[in-house]
Amino acid sequence: MTQDEMKKAAGWAALKYVEKGSIVGVGTGSTVNHFIDALGTMSEEIKGAVSSSVASTEKLEALGIKIFDCNEVASLDIYVDGADEINADREMIKGGGAALTREKIVAAIADKFICIVDGTKAVDVLGTFPLPVEVIPMARSYVARQLVKLGGDPCYREGVITDNGNVILDVYGMKITNPKQLEDQINAIPGVVTVGLFAHRGADVVITGTPEGAKIEE
């Protein structure tokens, strides 16, 4: 089974958590695209979706799924999204696709965060995948200097502007042994919009695509 087939297995397995008549929180990325395809088979049975990115919105709308603005929805039953890395405590690095801030907002209003990944994303310690930080453009150099003080090696992701009009610094060389503490430290830097650590709001359910099919941990 290829990596993409494992992603597909995870994405389709998440469909069992979708309730008829509900509004579904939808993330961003290659694994989520498979979930969106699966969700399309229920387009007549759900109210719609809250999307974390322009890319996902376009894909959902193409399948006839109504999009709700985050401000129209008080809460969501579920939020389905992928991760770049996930540890045993279900803390994650996200934001490889530059949608981390909107992903964090949609995750915050969801009762249940369902993380869909392939088996390559599980790690003992977060940080091998560079940690994305969304930054207001005028603060880029200042934030980078502060990230160096925290032990990181920040790299400006050239040519990328987020859906919010900001820039991304990818922080290399961090072994993140206390994700919640680091999430707080980075979010406290003036000019940071948010960091791609999902530690305070980790996953409630992890669905991993494996060569044998989808493995669900609740």
Swiss-Prot record:
> Known catalysed reaction(s)?
aldehydo-D-ribose 5-phosphate = D-ribulose 5-phosphate
Q: Which UniProt keywords apply?
A: Isomerase
| Record-listed E.C. numbers | 5.3.1.6
Kindly indicate whether the keyword RNA-binding belongs to this entry: no
Which pathway does the UniProt entry assign to this protein? Carbohydrate degradation; pentose phosphate pathway; D-ribose 5-phosphate from D-ribulose 5-phosphate (non-oxidative stage): step 1/1
Q: How does it assemble?
A: Homodimer.
Its protein name is Ribose-5-phosphate isomerase A
According to its UniProt entry, this protein's organism is Vibrio vulnificus (strain YJ016)
Source organism phylogeny: Bacteria, Pseudomonadati, Pseudomonadota, Gammaproteobacteria, Vibrionales
